[in-house]
Amino acid sequence: MENRIEMSQLRASKKDSKISYVLLMATKLYLESSQPVGSKLLKETYCSDLSSATIRNYFAQLETDGFLRKNHISGGRIPTDLAFRYYVDHNVPFLEQEEILAIQQKLTELPEYSKNIVKDLQKASEVLSDILQLPVCFSSPRFESDSVINIQLVAIDDQRVVFVLSTEFGQVFTDVLWLPEQLPENSLKRIEGFLQNYLRKQPSDGLLSQKEEDLGMVLYNEVVVRYLTRYCHFSEEDLYQTGLSRLLKYGTFKEPETLAQGLAFFENRKHMCQLLNTYLHKETPTAFIGRELADIVGNTDPSCAVITIPYYMDHTPLGAFGVLGPMNLPYQQVFGTLSLFTERLKVILTQSFYKFKLSFRRPCPTDPRCSQRPAELTRSSSIKLLPAKELS
């Protein structure tokens, strides 16, 4: 009796193993072709030891279990998010040698080390997006002892001006300010030159009037206080994105509704920060596929996939990169690329942190180091307010 039970379990185990193999190969074939998979084609490519009838029976069971769905036009099967999850969990990252060499060559565009840390991370995201041909985002903490190095003023109309501050670490801060009155021609350029000389501790060129100088100081002090408020008090990591238009080359996102869902999810700062922080201490890539995204953020199924991986300075995670794409991503190649990418980035960031003695802080509702007094705010961020003056 015991022998019969053991033989029955063995036969069941072998059948389950074959069904699993059919699922993996059907998913693999779908990822390669982006076409529904039929039993005949699967037999010809990866399952020559199985009959077409047996494969169809396995397809039917996998469809019942929610791993495959039938394409009503061709009769072939299409993997669901459950199938892609199973595929990811049972395959290791893989890259061909020529792919590795091409990626390593592309990564030489990144600097060996740099103090311009935010700009370099943005450059890294552009490189990664170019390699994968997919949208990329990354989260970043705030880096300490930053300072403003450049100011630009851009007129929108007669009463509004865009104020652009750029910092030593590559941060860019913009805000819109209202002018008290319409300025004469070239007046804004003279004010901009005055403020740039101030930042560089150079004397004024004397070309602007006292009224223009007073207005420049008022505008500068206003925008610096706004900048310091954002810089010192933040509840989420800084989030940067690039390459969103690359979604358009995938058939899945040619449907306006699917594209809108994917973009809405990727551009939701709260959801993306939550997703990027989920496995911040896991050094390998993590895939969130289909309904898994909805489970995490409590949203409708976006019918896409996001793959995340943290990036490190030495043994400390600083943030994470995220890649957005359709559910039929080439997971093995994406995982392998992300691992190579973050290994290189870790070397760069570690060298930069030790060479320039950089430090950072994470978001919190209130930061005890930053008070409401402007003098203490400016000491914390290495930005000085101009002397207070009244407009004449």
Curated annotation (Swiss-Prot):
InterPro entries in UniProt: GAF-like_dom_sf, HrcA, HrcA_C, WH-like_DNA-bd_sf, WH_DNA-bd_sf
Keywords: Repressor, Stress response, Transcription, Transcription regulation
GO MF entry, a single one: DNA binding
GO annotation, biological process: negative regulation of DNA-templated transcription
Stretches assigned to coiled coil: none
NCBIfam families: hrcA
Family indicated by similarity: Belongs to the HrcA family.
Purpose of the protein: Negative regulator of class I heat shock genes (grpE-dnaK-dnaJ and groELS operons). Prevents heat-shock induction of these operons.
Protein name per the record: Heat-inducible transcription repressor HrcA
